[in-house]
Amino acid sequence: MRTCSLHQLHVVTYENGMKLQQKLVEMRQREELDDQLLLLEHPPVITLGRGGDAKNLLASPEALEAEHVRFFETTRGGDITYHGPGQVVGYPILHLGEGRRDVRKYVTMLEEVLIRTVAEYGITAERAEGKRGIWVGNDKIAAIGVRIAKWVTSHGWALNVNTNLEHFRLITPCGLHGTGVTSIARELGRAVPMDEVRTILAAKFAEIFERELVPRPETLRLVKVLVHDGDRVLLLHRKPERGHFWQPITGTIDDGESPLQTARRELVEETGNRGEVEELGLTQSFMIESQYLESRYPAPIIASEVLYSAHLDARAPVVIDPAEHDDYGWFTFAEAYEKIRWTDDREAFERLQQAQHAALAVMTTT
């Protein structure tokens, strides 16, 4: 039985998900690794496939920004769809070798994975003639869109588990008028543990594709600490030989250390200050290019990062680590968005802003 590496990822920005897929596809085409299966969640995002019609996006750019939903045109097949928290997105990177080069059969097998998964919850889902995806009556519960390059697959499925279905009002799902959307939670009338659904999906995938799934842990476990004074955020500038970019405080979790302990340690080591560190309820996964780690790890380098915040008076002296950084600065959120390079940093700062707005709303009503 062929092996397939299973990556159980956290929240992955859409851009980072595309970069990771591209890297894995290229490596699989060169036969530098075995088949891969990525299971993850995306932040709120609307994507338009190669065969899609932009008219199926019903919201203006201003409306999308107000909802904190991004929009991308992508390389997969299919029309328009929504990804967001509470969805299990699956990206199989498989080599369809001799005897398996049947695109229709491949899509049918993906559909079967989803049909059998929701059946575990007593939900009867079906294929629908002339429609993409998996359906419960007239409501879509899962979307499918794939890409195949040199007989290596990418993209895949999005299964609605505990998804905020209100965001689907921003689009005409898959360009189909008169149809609705649903989720496992909606069908059952209760939320469902995401890890439980992931486990079932992986088992059904292994069964249908006849693969031995081999769990692959992340290469690095990190923390990110967003230091702020309420209105501005602190960024550190990495030295040219260390990447030459602006970033929040970031550090590796040492053996025997909890993420919170790492966050507190990094705050002291990177700024010379102590402060109250709070978790922001977000863990992200992303790929790190080997040049930023001096090729210490074999590709692909996949990291997970737990997000924290810390309040610091901007008048306090900041003592940076000269081995890593050559400058620092306090910036408004708008200025920080212009300076940071990585989409996961942007997602982190948006989460901090949302937490600040929520705290302000509580103070206003009490």
Regions found by a protein language model. Give the residues of each.
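Active-site segment of metal-dependent pyrophosphate-handling enzymes
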Residues: 128-130, 138, 144, 272-316
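Short, well-ordered beta-strand micro-motif
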Residues: 41, 160, 227, 307-311
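Long, positively charged amphipathic alpha-helical accessory segments at protein N-termini or as interdomain linkers
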Residues: 7-9, 99-142, 147-217
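N-terminal lobe of the biotin/lipoate ligase/transferase fold
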Residues: 1-135, 140-141, 191-192
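Conserved Nudix-box catalytic region and its N-terminal flanking loop in Nudix hydrolases
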Residues: 104, 232-274, 366
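NUDIX/MutT-family hydrolases
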Residues: 177-179, 307-309, 318-350
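Charged phosphate-binding loop/patch that engages nucleotide di/tri-phosphates or the phosphate backbone
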Residues: 199-204, 208-217, 338-366
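Conserved N-terminal beta-strand and adjoining loop/helix that marks the start
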Residues: 216-233, 252-255
